Amino acid sequence: MKEHKARKRFGQNFLQDTRIIGDIVNAVRPQADDVVIEIGPGLAAITEPLAKKLNRLHVVEIDRDIVCRLKTLPFADKLVIHEGDVLQFDFNGISGKKKIVGNLPYNISTPLLFKLAEVADDVADMHFMLQKEVVERMVAAPKSNDYGRLGVMLQYFFDMELLIDVPPESFDPAPKIDSAVVRMIPVKHRIGKADDFDHFAKLVKLAFRQRRKTIRNNLKELADDDDLQAVGISPQDRAEHIAPEKYVALSNYLADKAV
């Protein structure tokens, strides 16, 4: 079969390290009847060992050449191939609690993670290969340099853990950055639930717009000092010092106040 060359516009770096591949599959723990969706199967490094354990495997792939390759594989009868852009894919169109896995293209990782957060209620767990610095931002705790908007928003939906460090030489072509595998499990019992999620998302975005400024300055168009203090936030704090549940509490307080 003709060798497939990685395409930069699709952010393709193909995993080839068999040890890492095995570790990822073991982390996913696929059972025969599981509903599993793989994003960006590429050259089937993870696809093949997953398919061996599953009755059916959904794959989402934008590269037409790779789609053609997938159709010729010995286990192609187990694959349900969805050709297209994963950012436009309807995850709710596949019924059942889903396990989602993939080596995510670095150039669309953040918008894709936010899209997946929208379907968290229908997800069992997710395992993704990502740029390591992105994973560190996802799992970061308050008062750390990596803690920011991405972490707050995703921690609202998921419990997350950095599972596996992946060096550049595990890929072909080798990227110029380190990678990591993250496990994401939907939160079962949230400390607080946002009454108006759009308001909560806007508040968090504004809070981190200028990290060096105080929360008072960043949120001045939404909240005054009394509002902040009402939920236990010091107006002098910076955004990275404030836990996710405090942002939820502030959003709910402001929403109630506006009624």
Curated annotation (Swiss-Prot):
This is Ribosomal RNA small subunit methyltransferase A. Specifically dimethylates two adjacent adenosines (A1518 and A1519) in the loop of a conserved hairpin near the 3'-end of 16S rRNA in the 30S particle. May play a critical role in biogenesis of 30S subunits. S-adenosyl-L-methionine binds at N13, L15, G40, E61, D85, N103. It is found in: Cytoplasm. Keywords: Cytoplasm, Methyltransferase, RNA-binding, rRNA processing, S-adenosyl-L-methionine, Transferase. Pfam families: RrnaAD (PF00398). GO terms for molecular function: 16S rRNA (adenine(1518)-N(6)/adenine(1519)-N(6))-dimethyltransferase activity; RNA binding. Transmembrane segments: none annotated. SMART domains: rADc. One of its GO terms (cellular component) is cytosol. Its EC number is 2.1.1.182.
